[in-house]
UniProtKB/Swiss-Prot annotation:
It comes from Dictyostelium discoideum. This is Putative uncharacterized protein DDB_G0287169. InterPro entries: HAD-like_sf, HAD_sf.
Amino acid sequence: MDNNFRCIAFDLGGVLFSAGKEFAKAEWSSYGYDVVLIHDELVSEKAQQLRKGMISDNEFWNIYLKSKVPSNYDVDLIKQAYYRGYILDEDLSNWMKNTLKKPGNNYKLVAFSGNIPSRIQYLEDKYHFRSLFDAEAYSFDCGATKPDNYFIEYLIKICFPQETKDVVLKHGEPLIGQQLSLFQELGKQILYLDDSVKDSAPAKRYNINTFIYERGHINKLFEKYPNLNK
């Protein structure tokens, strides 16, 4: 295996699925909705609380967002357009099914995302993507999202549960000393696919191999790691 990778971690939005907001913006605009207003609310502090599992779907969409947009806006339409914008990258999914899961390729495949439960469920219902993975790391399960060090530490624990079972993570207190050294050694065995340089930056503290993926350019991944296509 390339660089002794034991685990390949895939971001969902922007990697396995296209970045949904750009598609959603076109649909919102077609209804005459204020795209900037909606987008700002979807990246607001309240939206971050939703991603971290601190508030419910109902509280965000039907109470908070409904109070922030004009009364004639259909909040359910806004939400469904936001979900529909995520399109599966078939280059990646076919590579995962036909190559990475071949007998002899013993990579652990892990999904990660700063996302919300209902959108994950929507994508699962539409694409059945979870069958591609051996494990999943979501912001709403750990109370942190990218680019937080805690989220990366949580991802490493998901990748290597046995090796890290005695390590207790704490929000706002990144690992130090021997525990950090352990996570850095494990990090060398992870290939981390993201579409954002900013979001992937904390992974480097843990010696994780990061690759910035561009939809339609899977060949660049194989150029850097040719053994991944065997």
